[in-house]
Amino acid sequence: MFSQNMIIRDGEYTKTIYTMIKEERFQDAINTLNTIPESSTTRAGLSLLGHCYYQTQDFIEAANCYEHLLNLVPDVQEYRLYYAQSLFQAGLFEEAQKIIATGLDSPELKEKVLQLQSAIAYGNEDYTAAQSLLLQRQDGNGQEASTKNDEGCLLYQANMYEDALQRYVSALQAGGFNPHVAYNAALCHYRRKENSQALNYIAEIVERGIRNHPELGVGAQAETEGGARSVGNPPALAASGLAQAFNLKAAIEYQEGNADGAREALTDLPPRSEPELDPVTLHNMALTDPTGGGAGLRRLAFLLELGPPACPPETFANLLLLCCKHEMYDTAADILAEHTHLTYKYLSPYLYDLLDALITAQSTPEEAEQKLGTLASSIGGRLRALAAKVQECRSATDQNALRMALREYEGALESYLPVAMARAWIPWRMDDFQGAEREFRASAEFCSETPSWRLHAAHVLFMRGDRYKEAAAFYEPIVRQNYDDILSIPASVLANLCVAYIMTSQNEEAEELMRKVERAEERKGNATGQCLHLCIVNLVIGTLYCAKNNYEFGLSRIAHALDGGSGARLCADTWIHVKRCVLGLLTGMAKQTIVLPSIALQETLNFLRACEAYGLTIPSVLTGPLEDSGEQPPTIGLEARKLRALLLRLMEYK
């Protein structure tokens, strides 16, 4: 690494600087040039600085250098082109267009100028102008691959993914492998839901990137658990297409519901510090952040403030969806109100109507139900028409038409499912589980084979309190499907299934399932962190017995689940079960409707004393992703002490 204290002998500056540029040590070259006063006033110095700044992606500084060069030598057309290119890369499209319009008319540069002009029009989303400029370009002089790629980009923006893919394949055939063109082809496959083909292109990009650029340290973050040294943003990273490839892989994993796989794909990226990350990587890290929504929301809000072209177009919608996911509906409403100009640009009518209904549900549930009902009817009608179309294509044995019809049907179903869930969620949040079940029955026509629909339908039946057998019938296929990897099943599913077995007198099945979970946790050990599956199962079962007024057994089960209150399992998530059950016991004792043996009361006191000791610094409540009141949250230790004091008072009451 170059040091500013490096001594360069007189007469060797030129050799040293050009060696640095040859070795792609552009920042070192910039540092050296900046020690020479003449660099900022001479043609040679400014030319070298402009090139180096451009290669380090400091496009504003590069533009400044080329602007000075134009003042020194206004007749050199190449500098005007480089100036415009730097402005374009900096996102200053209007300024770049002005530079082109003021004298950039060299016949030798015509093709490059047309290419830049079409790129500016494309960046401004003026696709008609971009198409017109593209038609003026010639395919000769090795430009065929570039032209085919640009044609593909325009077709992609028109949602003509199959035609765009053909152009990208032609570009690869005409110009040989190019990671950026290969990425574009992978993106088309992704949009067509052909993930295996997309992953094939991604694998080739990654393989070539690792082979050709070992200095980028692909996978180093995973090997060093995030402690790898940043490689920055060298030209090799931009040329390799690795950032785009890994981000697309993360998107595929995320879309398939594999959040861990998405995070792993992002971890495999060449190591960079957060300020060095490109907007797309920052956006995807926000969506896959495992620590909660706070950091993700802040990252997305930061990107939104950057605005285009730096801000990915999906940012606005994902920020609103993330707010709704964390039940921050007021925040979502504020964002919509503050960015009305983005609403029509980045939100489809469907997504806007869905978000509007979710936000409206907070104040007027009836109006939200009406909006969602209208949306569901519209999509439902389209689904029926598409289902008929699929049947027609099957009868006609037209495989291409069948594939297209199935793709359309799946896309419509993806739109329908969130609406159906939202309609059931409105009565669910008001504890109207019968109403929620009614909504699930209404959507069963289209969604009954969808895993997420079946899971949530099971939850609704379970909460009915008298439909445990039906709930178990929905839970069992989920468990059987992942029986060999039982810890991959949500703990709530296992707990609810055990309770359903107990409530339908299938105690042996419940015990067998719990033994299976216990053995899996023992095998897993502490290698990959704390396992709470068996703990949560026992907590839910204990809560069930407490709800049935069997506090002696219920509280003993809860204490066992939390290792007597002295283990690492004591946290806000688990403490809430303890609080509810102990408060239920205290209420019953105060009303003199519950009597517990002295030994059971003493065990409860010992359990609360252990929680008090081990929970002194553990927050007792879960906070929202952006909650920061400045006040210290209550702790488990403090609440356990209060509960113990109340229990002692009631025990002394005669």
Swiss-Prot record:
GO terms for molecular function: intraciliary transport particle B binding. The keyword Magnesium does not apply. GO terms for biological process: intraciliary transport; protein polyglutamylation. Belongs to the TTC30/dfy-1/fleer family. This is Tetratricopeptide repeat protein 30 homolog. Keywords: Cell projection, Cilium, Cilium biogenesis/degradation, Repeat, TPR repeat. It is found in: Cell projection, Cilium. Required for polyglutamylation of axonemal tubulin in sensory cilia. Plays a role in anterograde intraflagellar transport (IFT), the process by which cilia precursors are transported from the base of the cilium to the site of their incorporation at the tip. TPR repeats lie at residues 10-43, 44-76, 145-178, 180-212, 393-426, 452-485, 535-568. InterPro entries: TPR-like_helical_dom_sf, TPR_rpt, TT30. The lineage of its organism: Eukaryota, Metazoa, Ecdysozoa, Arthropoda, Hexapoda. One of its GO terms (cellular component) is axonemal microtubule.
